[in-house]
């Protein structure tokens, strides 16, 4: 271990560190697999490549707390060879992120319709990151939720809770017929905030 550590110290890139250690490069997400580490090989062809990705989901624009316009984001996605973009700005409960109230949702949808006409066959999907409230309800009425192509449901408030409370909120959100995706399931913020406890098996 010490001899390998000495070889990789000061390497400018991960690839160079592996090269210095006399090992084939192994992507970070595969390094916890003991079989791959001990065999020093893996099937690179089996990995998802950039060209396999057809679209980008869960994007915030400058309509809420994002930095760029929807048009800028769509054009950038097109340049990357993407076929679609899912705009999922923050919902109205996320006041700290300029979340969208109902009238802004309708305004944004009209704007997306215009962009889709200009950019077709590229497609911008209408989405929202809807807050899961303390009782597990989403923060829009069904009449608004029904207007989205897909809804990402996320917990952003009251994060310090028991597993029982967390599961109640998450399962209520899942049972909402308009929920498509759960966002950041445990609320964990890497290196700065622990997640709340959940029963992954039950959720799956």
Label each region the model flagged:
Residues 1-49:
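Acidic, metal-coordinating catalytic segment for phosphate/diphosphate chemistry
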Residues 78-79, 140-148, 172-178:
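Acidic (Asp/Glu)-rich catalytic clusters
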Residues 106-109, 138-150, 203-204:
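Short, electropositive alpha-helical surface patch
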Residues 134-144, 170-171, 193-197:
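Distinct, well-ordered alpha-helical segments
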Residues 148-158:
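Aromatic- and acid-rich polysaccharide-binding/catalytic face
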């Amino acid at each position: 271990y010490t001899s390998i550590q000495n070889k990789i110290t000061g390497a400018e890139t991960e690839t160079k560190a592996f090269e210095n250690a006399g090992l084939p490069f192994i992507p970070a997400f595969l390094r916890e697999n003991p079989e791959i580490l001990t065999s020093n090989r893996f099937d690179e062809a089996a990995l998802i490549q950039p060209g396999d990705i057809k679209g980008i989901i869960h994007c915030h624009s400058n309509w809420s707390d994002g930095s760029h316009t929807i048009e800028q984001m769509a054009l950038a996605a097109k340049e990357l060879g993407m076929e679609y973009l899912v705009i999922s700005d923050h919902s109205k409960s996320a006041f700290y992120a300029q979340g969208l109230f109902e009238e802004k949702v309708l305004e944004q949808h009209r704007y997306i319709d215009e962009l889709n006409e200009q950019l077709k066959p590229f497609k911008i999907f209408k989405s929202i990151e809807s807050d899961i409230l303390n009782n597990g309800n989403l923060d829009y009425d069904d009449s608004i939720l029904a207007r989205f192509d897909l809804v990402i449901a996320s917990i952003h408030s009251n994060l310090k809770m028991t597993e029982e409370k967390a599961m109640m909120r998450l399962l209520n959100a899942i049972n909402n017929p308009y929920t498509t995706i759960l966002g950041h399931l445990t609320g964990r913020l890497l290196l700065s905030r622990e997640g709340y406890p959940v029963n992954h098996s039950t959720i799956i």
